Amino acid sequence: MAYPMQLGLQDATSPIMEELLHFHDHTLMIVFLISSLVLYIISLMLTTKLTHTSTMDAQEVETIWTILPAIILIMIALPSLRILYMMDEINNPSLTVKTMGHQWYWSYEYTDYEDLSFDSYMIPTSDLKPGELRLLEVDNRVVLPMEMTVRMLISSEDVLHSWAVPSLGLKTDAVPGRLNQTTLMSTRPGLYYGQCSEICGSNHSFMPIVLELVPLKHFEKWSASML
């Protein structure tokens, strides 16, 4: 989860988020090098007294500054496309959970079970227990097994919402009348917090998401107790 005064991204807890962090660092380094070069050239232009006004064209220079940016763009595009295809690939999920957005709460249905569904509302600040997080705690957490592929089917019953959990690298729009899907797999147990990331009305800020990733045996006990 995020912390006060945090400058970087949240710690990765899924293979996709790890790839996104690597891509972020890769792209940031390219941008840093280009920015440094541009600032260096600008400083030279402002400080040097040398001028060369007789040059009308320079084919070699024009060729270089056409090819070099194209190569840089390819260096950014190829890793990005690789991650996009990884995020879009869904192979034999172990569990499917249907998520519906409402104004202003989430409802979840475990479609592999006959009658396992619930609504998830934010806990008001006045009802929080010591140690609980303001605007992030819910009355019903989404319990999922760790180290297993989980497919999330996401839609909405009223307006546009967006189901997002940053530490897992997840952000999928919930569109009325449309069923979007994404996958998640956590490499370690824990609580992972997210929020609705699409402005959806006056209580948009009060639609938290809490995922509780647990070992499979604990998930089986929880699902049995909910049925």
Swiss-Prot record:
Keyword tags: Copper, Electron transport, Magnesium, Membrane, Metal-binding, Mitochondrion, Mitochondrion inner membrane, Respiratory chain, Translocase, Transmembrane, Transmembrane helix, Transport
Mitochondrial intermembrane side: 1-14, 88-227
Positions contributing to Cu cation A1 binding: H161, C196, C200, M207
GO molecular function: copper ion binding; cytochrome-c oxidase activity
Enzyme Commission code: 7.1.1.9
Membrane topology, record value: Multi-pass membrane protein
Residue spans, topological domain Mitochondrial matrix: 46-59
Family matches, as Gene3D superfamilies: 1.10.287.90, Cupredoxins - blue copper proteins (2.60.40.420)
Binding site for Cu cation A2: C196, E198, C200, H204
Keyword Membrane (UniProt): yes
Record's subcellular location: Mitochondrion inner membrane
Positions bound to Mg(2+): E198
TM region positions: 15-45, 60-87
UniProt xrefs under CDD domains: CcO_II_C
Top enzyme class: translocase
InterPro entries for this protein: CcO_II (IPR045187), CcO_II-like_C (IPR002429), CcO_II_C (IPR034210), Copper_CuA (IPR001505), Cupredoxin (IPR008972), Cyt_c_oxidase_su2 (IPR014222), Cyt_c_oxidase_su2_TM_dom (IPR011759), Cyt_c_oxidase_su2_TM_sf (IPR036257)
Principal subcellular localization: mitochondrion
One Gene Ontology CC term in the entry: respiratory chain complex IV
Binding partners and assembly: Component of the cytochrome c oxidase (complex IV, CIV), a multisubunit enzyme composed of 14 subunits. The complex is composed of a catalytic core of 3 subunits MT-CO1, MT-CO2 and MT-CO3, encoded in the mitochondrial DNA, and 11 supernumerary subunits COX4I, COX5A, COX5B, COX6A, COX6B, COX6C, COX7A, COX7B, COX7C, COX8 and NDUFA4, which are encoded in the nuclear genome.
Designated name of the protein: Cytochrome c oxidase subunit 2
Organism from which the protein derives: Damaliscus pygargus phillipsi
Lineage per the UniProt record: Eukaryota, Metazoa, Chordata, Craniata, Vertebrata
Recorded name of the encoding gene: MT-CO2
